[in-house]
């Protein structure tokens, strides 16, 4: 029980802090493209932080990271990066916190039951989010009623289901690979906008999606297969 409580507190606090930093950053500067790119920088930070924990990635993994970052840039940054603003630092801190959350899940998920860890994590997030809302905002019942569906979807699907699957999936997965797979959210976001909201995808954005998907596939290809391809060529 103590280990489960500790795991839930650590993972939940990191998830709350990362989400709060992201939402505050977007509120200050509502550029979703830049927010998506900076937040997804955990794809690089996770293996970098992993070096300090004795996890040495091979060349295949690092090449995949570079390809993924290039793909994210093409997909998200349509008009260049622009100047660094205060909100950017918040979004970068969000990426750092999400990196720590992925590493924490990697550490705790093999030690405790995944579903119980998920419940503990979201209990902590709920308590800390409610406390922050009461301290820094003045929410009303009318606001909750008006935004009930988005709140329920974000709480149940985007948070509850998605992060439970993350915990279960990371039990036997390198956290660097997990971060690569999770950065596919940028791809699905773009594709969802195209399919459901009829938003146009430029050739640059499509190429960015292809690069990110290729990076995820490359990172998970067995080394033996790569050696065979190299010899055949």
Each predicted region: which residue ranges?
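Glycine-/small-residue-enriched transmembrane alpha-helix faces in small-molecule transporters
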Residues: 10-13, 17, 21, 70, ...
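Hydrophobic alpha-helical transmembrane segments of multi-pass integral membrane proteins
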Residues: 6, 10, 60-67, 86-93, ...
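Hydrophobic/aromatic residues within transmembrane alpha-helices
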Residues: 25, 51-57, 108, 117, ...
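Hydrophobic transmembrane alpha-helices of multi-pass small-molecule transport proteins
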Residues: 57-77, 129, 204-223
């Amino acid at each position: 029980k103590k280990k489960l409580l500790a795991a839930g507190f650590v993972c939940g606090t990191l998830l709350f802090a990362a989400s709060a930093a992201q939402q505050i950053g977007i509120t200050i500067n509502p550029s979703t493209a830049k927010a998506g790119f900076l937040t997804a920088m955990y794809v690089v930070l996770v293996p970098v932080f992993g070096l300090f924990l004795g996890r040495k990635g091979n060349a295949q993994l690092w090449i995949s990271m570079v390809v993924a970052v290039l793909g994210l840039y093409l997909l998200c940054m349509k008009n260049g990066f622009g100047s660094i603003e205060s909100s950017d630092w918040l979004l970068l801190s969000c990426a750092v916190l999400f990196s720590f959350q992925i590493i924490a899940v990697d550490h705790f998920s093999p030690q405790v039951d995944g579903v119980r860890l998920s419940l503990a994590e979201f209990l902590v997030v709920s308590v800390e989010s409610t406390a922050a809302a009461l301290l820094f905002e003045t929410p009303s019942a009318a606001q909750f009623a008006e935004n009930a569906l988005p709140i329920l979807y974000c709480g149940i699907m985007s948070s509850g289901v998605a992060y439970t699957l993350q915990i279960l999936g990371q039990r036997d997965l390198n956290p660097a690979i997990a971060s690569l797979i999770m950065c596919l959210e940028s791809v699905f976001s773009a594709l969802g906008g195209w399919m459901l909201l009829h938003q146009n995808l430029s050739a640059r954005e499509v190429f960015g999606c292809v690069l990110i998907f290729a990076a995820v596939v490359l990172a998970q290809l067995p080394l033996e297969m790569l050696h065979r391809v190299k010899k055949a060529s």
